[in-house]
Amino acid sequence: ADAAPWLGAMAFRTRVIGAIGDNKYASNVGYMVDNKGNEVYLPVVGEYTSRERGGLHSYDFNVALNFYDRIYLGATIGAYSVDYSRRSFYKESYPGDASTYSLENWFDTSGTGVDFKLGVIIRPFESSSFRIGAAIHTPTWFNLEDRASAIMTSDVDMNSDGTIDKDELYEYDTMDFPGESKTKYELITPWKYNLSLGYTIGRSVALGAEYEYSDYSSAKLKYDDGVKMEDETSQIKTGLKGVHTLRVGAEFKLAPEFSFRVGYNYMTAAMYDDTFKRIALNSISTSTEFSNLKATNNYTVGLGYKGSVFYADL
C-alpha cells in the first residue's frame, strides 16, 4: 500500500477529503453545489489558538587562562535539557449549512544535548585597550524524543449522488495508535563562528562589535538507530541557508555607580522566501503551522547600577 502521512489519513477518515481517482484526493469542505450542479466556493472563517511552554535550558562549565594580560583563552562545555510542549486548535467554519471541521494537536519534545566552545581574546598592543576575539562553537548533539497526538472532527457527509451535506460528527483520534505517536532521533546543529572587536576609551566609554556566522542548511537529523532521516534532512538543506549576525554596542559610565548602554543586532533570514513546512510521509506530526521569519533588526537600551553590595540592570 502507498504511504500516507497521519494528517492525510485523518482527513480521509473524517471525510474532509475524498478520493476522486487512483491516488487522487480532493477537499470536501469549503464549497457547496447549487441546484444547477455548480460548485460554489464559500468564504471561510478560521479560528486558531496555540499555547506553548518549556524550552531549552543550558548549563555551562567554563575554564579560562590568562597569559600576561595580553592573551585570554576560554573553553566551555555546554549541557542542554529540552522540555517543550505545544497545544493548538484549528477550526474552519463556513456560512449557511456548509460543513465544518476542526483539528486539535498535542506535541511534546524532550531530550538532552551537549556541545563545546573555544575562544580567544588578544590585545595586540600592550599600551592599548583594543582587543580582537575569535570563537568557534561545535555542533550541538541532541538526543530527542517527539510525542504527538491529534483529534480531527468534521460533520461532512457524502451523498450517493456525490453531493455533500452537513451530517453527524466524524472523529479520528491518533491516540488509538499510541505505539505510533513517538519518534526518537538525533539532531546535529550547525557549526558557529564568531569574530569580535572591543575598545575602551578611558574609564568612561566601552565599545564593542561582533560578527557571527552559522550555516543552518548543514544541520542533520538521524533516527536513534543511526539511520539518516533523508526527507527531513533534505528539507533542511534546500529550505535553510547561512545566517549572518552583526551586533554592536556601547556603554557609557555616567557616574562611578551608573552606566547607560545602547545596542543594535541585525540577523539575516534563516529561510528562503519560498520555504514552507512540508510534513514527511512517515512523520507523526499533524501540525502545519510554521513561521518563515525574515531578517530582523533589534535595538536595545539599558541602565545599570553597581554598588558595593548591590547591583541591578534594566
What are the residue ranges of the model-derived segments?
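Outer-membrane beta-barrel porins/channels
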Residues: 1-314
